Curated annotation (Swiss-Prot):
It comes from Danio rerio. Transmembrane segments: none annotated. It is an enzyme of class 2 (transferase). NAD-dependent protein deacetylase, which deacetylates internal lysines on histone and alpha-tubulin as well as many other proteins such as key transcription factors. Participates in the modulation of multiple and diverse biological processes such as cell cycle control, genomic integrity, microtubule dynamics, cell differentiation, metabolic networks, and autophagy. Plays a major role in the control of cell cycle progression and genomic stability. Deacetylates histone H4 at 'Lys-16' (H4K16ac) at the VEGFA promoter. Residues 21-32 have a biased composition (Acidic residues). The gene is sirt2. This is NAD-dependent protein deacetylase sirtuin-2.
């Protein structure tokens, strides 16, 4: 402890109100302990410059968050998103009982559900992962309302960054660029040979062709497995996650958390990296992130606090992600614009898919004709 902090501890220990605590009863002893802990938290918060300061939100409601966004004081929004933002696109989340991904993997005969995303298991038994990838491959789904809401934040100059746990690339399909995104758990956008001596890179189209031809992707240079650049259990997160985190979160003036259970570290602990004045909005089916992430004394309110008497910046809006986004858009006066964006972009995707289907059908027809002509000549 520094000399300055030690001095302040001694000075504030003499503060009236901390003297004369009685030990006559266990209740009074507990109260004394709570008071001393509150005192220490307060002291370290002030000493390290982490005290809440003035409230930014006038009330802990979605309406207040909307007013804050419209005030002009909110210019660096960070979005933290998980699988819940993609469920309305038809992509299952991981943990929902009965419908989540982990609850529906019995057909792959795994030793346990998480094995399908463990790097050691994948290297020995890649078949279950690639079978699942055929079912969930990016490009089979359309972005949701929330994906386009993030794009709208970018278009309005309000988005600092989107930190995503998802590997479905729907943020990119919705119009976000690589610089707008931190894909914390990786992406299907690129793939690499798993051999440390090779590491040859492959495109998304190459991987897609391999997966839908029902072949196990192998490197054409060394013969090793090729794996999409998603982060498996047992692998490190992308280095950009850590470098961007240090630059982004101190600048954040509104954190929007959506569709994540906040159970997977280190992603979950990002909520504690914004300043203590920064409002945090959770849009989810249930409240989450309320633990202190094991930070003990130095957890200066790092966990979400929606309901206590000391709550001052955390807002929970319990709904589906799409409904919550549309409600917020309406409060911001952006609802019609968002609805039109979703309709327009989905129509473009349908048009591209139709052209692609026609092209594939034409190529298939030409191949069939060529094969028939070849057969006729042979006969």
């Amino acid at each position: 402890m520094s000399e300055e902090v030690s001095k302040r501890v001694e000075e504030e220990a003499d503060t009236p109100g901390l003297e004369g605590q009685s030990d006559d009863s266990s209740d009074e002893g507990d109260a004394s302990g709570d008071t001393e802990m509150d005192f220490l938290r307060s002291l370290f918060s002030r000493t390290l410059g982490l005290s809440p300061g003035d409230k930014v939100l006038d009330e802990l409601t979605l309406d207040s968050v909307a007013r804050y966004i419209l005030s002009g004081k909110c210019k660096n929004i960070i979005c933290m998103v998980g699988a819940g933002i993609s469920t309305s696109a038809g992509i299952p989340d991981f943990r929902s009982p009965g419908t989540g991904l982990y609850a529906n993997l019995q057909k792959y005969n795994l030793p346990y559900p998480e094995a399908i995303f463990q790097i050691d298991y994948f290297k020995k038994h890649p078949e279950p992962f690639f079978a699942l990838a055929r079912e969930l491959y990016p490009g089979q789904f359309k972005p949701t309302v929330y994906h386009y809401f993030i794009k709208m934040l970018k278009d309005k100059g309000l988005l600092r960054r989107c930190y995503s746990q998802n590997i479905d690339t729907l943020e990119r399909v919705a119009g976000l660029e690589g610089e707008d995104l931190i894909e914390a758990h990786g992406t299907f956008h690129t793939s690499h040979c798993v051999s440390f001596l090779c590491r040859k890179e492959y495109s998304m189209d190459w991987m897609k062709n391999q997966i839908f031809s029902e072949e196990i992707p192998k490197c054409d240079s060394c013969g090793s497995l090729v794996k999409p650049d998603i982060v498996f259990f047992g692998e490190s997160l992308p280095s950009r996650f850590f470098t961007s985190m240090k630059a982004d979160f101190p600048q954040c003036d509104l954190l929007i958390i959506m569709g994540t259970s906040l159970q997977v570290q280190p992603f979950a602990s990002l909520v504690s990296r914004v300043s203590n004045r920064c409002p945090r909005l959770l849009i989810n089916m249930e409240k989450t992130g309320q633990s202190e992430f094991g930070m003990g004394l130095f957890s200066f309110g790092g966990g979400m606090d929606f309901d206590s008497d000391k709550a001052y910046r955390d807002v929970a809006h319990l709904s589906t992600c799409d409904d919550g986004c549309m409600t917020l858009a309406e409060l911001l006066g952006w609802k019609k614009e968002l609805e039109e964006m979703v309709k327009r972009e989905h129509a473009l995707i349908d048009s591209k898919d139709a052209k692609k289907t026609d092209k594939e059908a034409s190529q298939s027809s030409k191949s069939a004709v060529a094969e028939a002509e070849k057969t006729d000549k042979t006969e």
